[in-house]
Every structure is written in C-alpha cells, then in structure tokens.
C-alpha cells in the first residue's frame, strides 16, 4: 500500500498532503535539545543552502536548455495534430451484398422469374407490387437465389448500405421514410378490417397453398414451368436439375411438414385443408363484391397482398389439376377480375417479364445502334486514320525539303571558301 500511494501524485492524495503540513509546525515549535546543537547545525544549514543554490542553478540551466533546444519540438508537437486533422477519414464499411450501390436506390432480392408468374413467392410479389404501385425507384438483384437476409428470408432489400428484411417490415419502413401510405384514405374501421384480412391471407391461405406445393413438388415445376437452369444460373441440363430438385425437396418435405404441423394446418386431412381454402376465398369474394378494389376505386395494402396471394392460384397452368384454383375460377369470378386489374395497373410489362424472364424489365434499356450508325462511325474512324496518315506524310516531305536546302547551302559555303 505504501508503494502504491507513493506513486500517486500529491494532488490526487489530499490526506497525505494535509498530514505533512500538520507535522511541519510541530517540528518548528519544538525547542533544540541543547545549545551546542545550534552551532553544529549552522554549517549544515549553509551546506544545505549551497546545495539548494546549485540545484536552483542546475534547474535554471535546464530550463534555459529547454527554452533553447526544445522549442522546435513543441512546434512539431503542435503541428502534428494539424497533420492528423488533414487526413481523410476512413471509408465507411457497409455490411451488404451490393457494395457499389447508388444512393436512394432500393435493391430488391427475391426469387427468379417464371414463364407464368413474376415470382413464385407471394411475399416477393407483394413487395415488388407495392414498390411499383407507390412509384419508388428500385432494382432487382440477379443473385440466382444465392443470398438470404440476416433472418434467412426472401425477400429483403438493401437501401443506402442498410438491409431491411421481411415483406411487412419493408413496406412499413419505406412507407415511413418516403411518406407513401396506401391506406391514408381509410377510416379506422376499414384499417382494422384490412389488418385482419391481411392476417387471414398471410397466416392461413398462404399456408394452404404451401401445403399443396410441399405435397406435390413435381406440380410446382410443371405448373409454373420453372426453368431451374435459368433460375439457379447453372449449365447442367434441366433433367438432371429436376432430379436433384426432387431429392432435395423430398428432404425438405419433412421439415415442411413439421412447420405445417407447428402452424396447425398440417394436422388436418387434405380434404379439410381444401375446405379451409375455399372458405377463405369465399370471404374475400364477398368482401370485394362488385367494387374494383376492396375499399373502392383505388387499391390499398389489402389489394396488394390479395393480388400477390391469389396470383399464385390463378396463373397456375391449366395442365395441372388444383381444386382450389378451379373453385376460385368458377365460384369467385370477381377475384379473377381483381387480379387482372392489379396486373394491368402494376405490371404493364408482365408479358415481357415472363417471356424474357427479365428481372428489370421496368428499367429503360439503352437503344441498340443501327447498322447505318455503325457504318457511319466506322467511316469516321477510317477518315480520321487517313487524315493522320496524310499529316505524317506531309511532315516527312517537309523534313526532306528542309534537309535538302541545308545540304545545298552547306555546299555553297564550301565552294565559296575554296
């Protein structure tokens, strides 16, 4: 403890300093032991004074040296922070897949296109439909389904170096950031109805569709005409990819059945699940009635979600038997009309998307150069090359002429000297 206290500066230990001050007056008040001690102490005092003087002189010399020799060091010390301030700050690192992003561009990560439907995921189609409906600038990232969000999901977006996952959270965050509220014209009661209906669509009807897909994986590939070679970006033939797809899908079937049972829908029979789906479609049909959209003449968030889910049924190939799709076509024709209206409003490039499987058909492409333009450009280049070659030849001729003149003048001078 004594050594630790000794290392602490005096201003940090006020108790020690006070104790030393209290001892000093006691020492001065004490009388000398005898009179002989005073003369003996005098030389010691003189020596101490001489030593103190030498110390003071030494300290003064040190101070002079410091003033003379250490002033440049102080200047350097002062200049050092200025140099550090002028240095550029390190570049900010973003934990995103697309590091060369443009500011305020929404980068959407989703599944690949199919010939019948822009996306096999109702959640991905929901986000892209909403982005198109509100008019926000976005770009699909062709990642060949390699990436997932930090939550392990698709879709997710990246905006200004930040990741946002889950379709509901994406729409909520973007609505707040850009003030794009599709439900601003709804009453409180209508918003409550919308919220409850969206919950039915996403937490009940979608799971009924997923149950059918998990049970019949072959029908998923055939029903939507999925090209795995294009979707995965692989060169293997589709026959081999389809074979491996069945194996991997068979393994995931057990995981899927566990999820379906945990959800609750998977504990029922196929007939019971089908009836649940028909009841959901009937409720939606009665809500829509004869209106163009669920709450009037303009689409809202409920219309976006309903379109994304019902499209999974409506655009399934007629070659594949699916009772739930047939029920919607026969018993709920107004839902078919709703899907068509949303498609025309949000996806005018639907045919181009499905034929070319283009993720970014909505982004204008640069016009290809015509043959005439290419020929004209080639002629201009050839003319420029000919011009440069002609200039070189002229310069060489001028040099030859100047050399001839110099040689003739030199010969004349030699003759004159002779």
UniProtKB/Swiss-Prot annotation:
Skewed-composition ranges (Basic and acidic residues): 46-77, 364-418
Superkingdom of the source species: Eukaryota
GO cellular component: cytoplasm; plasma membrane
Cysteine pairs bridged by disulfides in the record: none
Ranges of compositional bias, category Low complexity: 9-19, 28-45
Keywords assigned by UniProt, alphabetized: Developmental protein
Annotated stretches, region: Disordered: 1-95, 361-418
GO biological process: axonogenesis; female germ-line stem cell population maintenance
InterPro entries: FAX/IsoI-like, Glutathione-S-Trfase_C_sf, Glutathione_S-Trfase, Metaxin_GST, Mito_Protein_Transport_Metaxin, Thioredoxin-like_fold, Thioredoxin-like_sf
A Pfam family the protein falls into: GST_C_6
Function: Together with Abl, involved in embryonic axonal development.
Similarity comment: Belongs to the FAX family.
Protein's UniProt name: Failed axon connections
């Amino acid at each position: 403890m004594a050594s630790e206290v000794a290392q602490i500066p005096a201003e940090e230990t006020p108790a020690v300093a006070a104790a030393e001050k209290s001892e000093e007056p006691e020492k001065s008040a004490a009388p000398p032991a005898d009179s002989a001690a005073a003369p003996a102490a005098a030389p010691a005092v003189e020596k101490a004074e001489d030593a103190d003087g030498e110390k003071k002189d030494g300290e003064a010399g040190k101070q002079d040296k410091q003033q003379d020799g250490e002033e440049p060091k102080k200047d350097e010390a002062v200049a050092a922070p200025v140099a550090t301030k002028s240095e550029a700050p390190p570049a900010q690192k973003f934990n995103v897949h697309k590091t060369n992003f443009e500011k305020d561009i929404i980068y959407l990560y989703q599944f690949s296109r199919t010939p019948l439907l822009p996306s096999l995921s109702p959640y991905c189609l929901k986000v892209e439909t909403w982005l198109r409906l509100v008019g926000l600038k976005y770009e699909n990232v062709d990642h060949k389904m390699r990436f997932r969000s930090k939550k392990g999901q698709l879709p997710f977006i990246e905006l200004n170096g930040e990741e946002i996952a889950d379709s509901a959270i994406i729409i909520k965050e973007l609505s707040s950031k850009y003030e794009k509220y599709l439900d601003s014209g709804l009453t409180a009661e209508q918003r409550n109805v919308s919220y409850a209906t969206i919950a039915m669509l996403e937490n009940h009807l979608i799971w009924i569709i997923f149950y059918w897909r998990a049970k019949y994986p072959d029908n998923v590939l055939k029903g939507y005409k999925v090209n795995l070679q294009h979707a995965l970006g692989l060169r293997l033939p589709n026959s081999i990819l389809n074979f491996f797809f069945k194996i991997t899908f068979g393994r995931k079937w057990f995981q899927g059945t566990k999820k379906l049972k945990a959800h609750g829908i998977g504990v029922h029979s196929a007939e019971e699940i089908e009836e649940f789906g028909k009841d959901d479609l009937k409720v939606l049909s009665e809500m829509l009635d004869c209106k163009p959209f669920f709450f009037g003449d303009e689409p809202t968030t409920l219309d976006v979600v309903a379109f994304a889910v019902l499209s999974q049924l409506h655009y399934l190939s007629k070659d594949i038997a699916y009772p739930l799709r047939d029920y919607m076509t026969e018993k709920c024709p107004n839902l078919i009309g709703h899907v068509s209206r949303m498609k025309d409003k949000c996806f005018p490039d639907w045919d181009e998307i499905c034929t070319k499987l283009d993720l970014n058909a909505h982004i204008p492409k640069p016009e290809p150069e015509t043959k005439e333009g290419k020929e004209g450009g080639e002629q201009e280049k050839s003319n420029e090359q000919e011009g440069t070659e002609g200039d070189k030849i002229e310069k060489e001729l001028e040099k030859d002429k100047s050399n001839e003149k110099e040689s003739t003048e030199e010969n004349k001078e030699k003759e004159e000297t002779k």
